[in-house]
Every structure is written in structure tokens, then in C-alpha cells.
Amino acid sequence: MNIGLFVPCFIDQLHPPAAIATLRLLEHYGHSVAYPESQVCCGQPVINAGQSDIAEYAARFETSFEQYDAIVCPSASCVATIRHLYPQLTSRCAAVVEKTYELCEFLVDKLAVASVPGRCGDRIAVHQSCHGLRELRLG
């Protein structure tokens, strides 16, 4: 499968290793993963700051990702913005919105991954995000 990796702006700026780990994980399962350099923020920070017009973000998302079989993002907040707000802005985004997934959702629901190989000597805590639980109905 040809996957477009949508990297949230906060990961891009504050924790790039998370984006690299996401790419490697998807490649581990045998998929071709690309990072379209034309991608921009989903627009959620702009909305949170009070601006409601994010049509430009939706249009840019559509042109950046239309050629991929799936779009995977390691952020439920960004995916919720894309799924719930973009269709209200333009009907052109429908095709890309339908193939946009939060990372864990993609692994479990699309790839049927039951466990991830590897070991970690530390304890790991999992945070079920509010947007993942409430807006995407994950978990």
C-alpha cells in the first residue's frame, strides 16, 4: 500500500523522532511510506485561536495527499479536524477524508495488527486521547 504520512505540526516542531518512528513502523509492515513536503498544518491551532476559515488548509491537504492509498497521522486531534471539519468546507476533500486514519486505528482496523514485535525494558503508559475517544470513537 502506498501511504502518505501526515505529520502534525507539533510533532514536526517538538518531537520529530515520533514522525520517524511512525514511518519506520508502517514500513515494517511492508508499506511504501512518503512524506509529502507540500503538507501543512491541519488548521486546528488556527481554529483554537478563534479563526474559523480553514478552507485553505483543506485544499492544501487534498492536493498533498490525493495520490495515496491511505493517509496516516499519529494524532487523533488532527484526524478529527480533517474528518469533521474538512467535509463542511469543500466536497473535493471527501475522497482524501475517507482514507485518512489515526495511526493506531490504521494498525488495528486496516492492517489487523494484534501486537507489535519488540521489547522494552521500561514500563509504558498509554494515553487514550480525548479526541480519539470522543470524536473518532477509538478505544
Which functions belong to the PLM regions below?
Residues 1-139:
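Iron-sulfur cluster-binding electron-transfer modules in prokaryotic oxidoreductases
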